[in-house]
């Protein structure tokens, strides 16, 4: 499983890029957090104030292990700010998944996460 934490304004770029490589299923959540940048200082009518927890997007994708590298490269390329990136661009975690069960059908494992037209079908892998 890939868990990516990205900037809010990069979500559409990342989704579009993932779709081009055949990633059809993902979960997306709005979250708040900070990393090395530690938040930002905003200025308003009443003065400036520190915002410690910044809005971010969390994307979770369950996929075959042999598709992880291509997917990570795609996320990095589409989520990075500018040519060299910036603090706050995000992180990608690669995690093991012990088992997947599709609730509707009871399918398990790889069959539970395959979609018509997805990355595995594009690579010629069948159910």
Where are these regions (language model features)?
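Positively charged, small/polar-rich N-terminal and surface patches that mediate targeting and assembly
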Residues: 1-127
């Amino acid at each position: 499983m890939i868990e990516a934490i990205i900037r809010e304004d990069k979500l559409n770029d990342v989704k579009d890029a993932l779709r081009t490589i055949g990633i059809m299923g993902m979960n997306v959540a709005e979250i708040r957090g900070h990393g090395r940048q530690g938040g930002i200082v905003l200025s308003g009518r009443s003065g400036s104030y520190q915002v410690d927890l910044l809005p971010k997007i969390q994307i979770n994708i369950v996929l075959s292990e042999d598709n992880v590298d291509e997917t990570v490269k795609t996320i990095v390329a589409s989520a990075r700010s500018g040519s060299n990136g910036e603090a706050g661009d995000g992180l990608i975690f690669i995690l093991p998944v012990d088992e997947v069960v599709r609730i509707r059908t009871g399918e398990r494992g790889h069959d539970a996460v395959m979609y018509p037209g997805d990355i595995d079908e594009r690579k010629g892998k069948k159910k």
